Amino acid sequence: GNAPAADMVLKAPGDAKMTKTAVP
């Protein structure tokens, strides 16, 4: 998804977490 680099690090392991940082 499209998010700041900081959030991407958390999403890298799995897009499943992206739902938490998808807003920003």
UniProtKB/Swiss-Prot annotation:
Modification after translation, per record: Binds 4 heme groups per subunit.
Predominant location: periplasm
Role summary: Participates in sulfate respiration coupled with phosphorylation by transferring electrons from the enzyme dehydrogenase to ferredoxin.
GO molecular function: metal ion binding
Keyword Cytoplasm: no
GO cellular component: periplasmic space
Key words, A-Z: Electron transport, Heme, Iron, Metal-binding, Periplasm, Sulfate respiration, Transport
Highest rank taxon of the organism: Bacteria
Name this protein carries in UniProt: Cytochrome c3-2
Organism: Nitratidesulfovibrio vulgaris
One GO term of the biological process aspect: anaerobic respiration
Region of interest: Disordered: 1-24
Localization per record: Periplasm
